[in-house]
């Protein structure tokens, strides 16, 4: 479940609000006209707190929201969902490139037609 209220993107707030050692997905953004505006979607497959504390955009975007997940697969799937939701609704994100599968895992995006076509092509190639 995503946090209902955006948090300030500062090291003190991140350390207080984000539990160390848990994977998760996050959105960096800003408040415009009283609403949170998505600007960057990302994830950590191992420790969301560390990812946010060391993020290149730590001081560029003033707010973040996040959700914990159980593992790297779920982090990839939720990041992909949020990324596709933004693109499908005309939201321009800073990160235009589709989320990558976690290291050493060949996961396919469940929301992406390209990913589905690639999976089918690989399956057909292996079967022949």
Question: Model-flagged regions — what are they?
Answer:
Residues 1-38, 43-128:
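Boundary/linker segments flanking structured domains
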């Amino acid at each position: 479940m995503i946090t209902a209220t955006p948090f300030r993107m500062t090291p003190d707030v991140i350390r207080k609000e984000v539990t160390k050692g848990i994977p998760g997905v996050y959105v960096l953004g800003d408040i415009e006209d009283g609403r949170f505006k998505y600007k960057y979607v990302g994830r950590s497959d191992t420790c969301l707190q560390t990812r946010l504390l060391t993020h290149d955009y730590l001081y560029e975007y003033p707010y973040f929201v996040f959700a914990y997940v159980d593992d790297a697969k779920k982090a990839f799937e939720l990041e992909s969902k949020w990324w596709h939701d933004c693109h499908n609704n005309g939201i321009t994100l800073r990160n235009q490139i589709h989320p990558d599968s976690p290291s050493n895992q060949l996961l396919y995006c469940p929301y992406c037609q390209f990913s589905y076509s690639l999976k089918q092509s690989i399956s057909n190639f292996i079967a022949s």
